[in-house]
């Protein structure tokens, strides 16, 4: 599922392709899958952001193709993005965060290039007070909703997995038995076993 989302959100919705510059916010299983697909699609610059607790995930992001990783708790992410891009900003901003509120959307809007960028959002917010509509329209930004994936995305994701081009074993970090389903879910959310990215359930464990 994460890899199929990677295809749908970055390739189909974000229109990432050859020489694209991309900001991926959140280095979890979704963000890392976006990293793989963006690299496969020919993106020339991939920036992944996360927090200090995401250290292990950020290292995996670099091994999967991220050119830069930014700890948003240690650096000003917008200033760093502009430094990396020479003040131009990025073509596409992908929000793969969870529970971060409006911050990823606001950063995405600011980090996009001067005109015509695309932001793909998960849309978990019920409302967005003081949305920067003027800046959004002046920059001619297109916002798309990241809501699942299509059959075509699944087919391409399976082909990507079968190609073994990327060390995807780094993403599937832990295995749990059925008796530990609750622990597995909490761990993926950062509240159980540390440094879990993607958990596999093994009935025989």
Regions found by a protein language model. Give the residues of each.
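N-terminal Rossmann-like NAD(P) cofactor-binding module of classical short-chain dehydrogenase/reductase
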Residues: 93-94
């Amino acid at each position: 599922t994460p890899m199929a989302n990677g295809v749908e959100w970055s390739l189909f919705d974000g229109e990432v392709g050859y020489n694209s510059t991309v900001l991926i916010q959140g280095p979890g299983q979704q963000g890392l899958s976006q990293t793989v697909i963006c690299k496969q699609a020919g993106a020339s610059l991939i920036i992944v952001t996360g927090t200090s607790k995401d250290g292990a995930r950020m290292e995996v992001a670099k091994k999967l193709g991220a050119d830069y990783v930014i700890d948003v708790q240690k650096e000003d992410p917008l200033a760093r993005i502009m430094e990396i891009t020479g003040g131009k900003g990025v073509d596409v901003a992908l929000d793969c965060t969870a529970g971060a509120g409006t911050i990823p959307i606001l950063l995405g809007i600011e980090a996009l290039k001067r005109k015509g960028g695309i932001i793909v959002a998960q849309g978990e917010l019920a409302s967005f007070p003081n949305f920067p509509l003027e800046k959004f329209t002046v920059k001619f930004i297109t916002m798309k909703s990241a809501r699942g994936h299509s059959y075509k995305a699944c087919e391409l994701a399976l082909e990507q997995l079968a190609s073994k081009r990327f060390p995807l074993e780094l993403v599937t970090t832990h295995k749990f038995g059925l008796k530990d389903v609750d622990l597995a879910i909490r761990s993926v959310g950062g509240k159980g076993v540390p440094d879990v990215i993607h958990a596999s359930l093994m009935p025989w464990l």
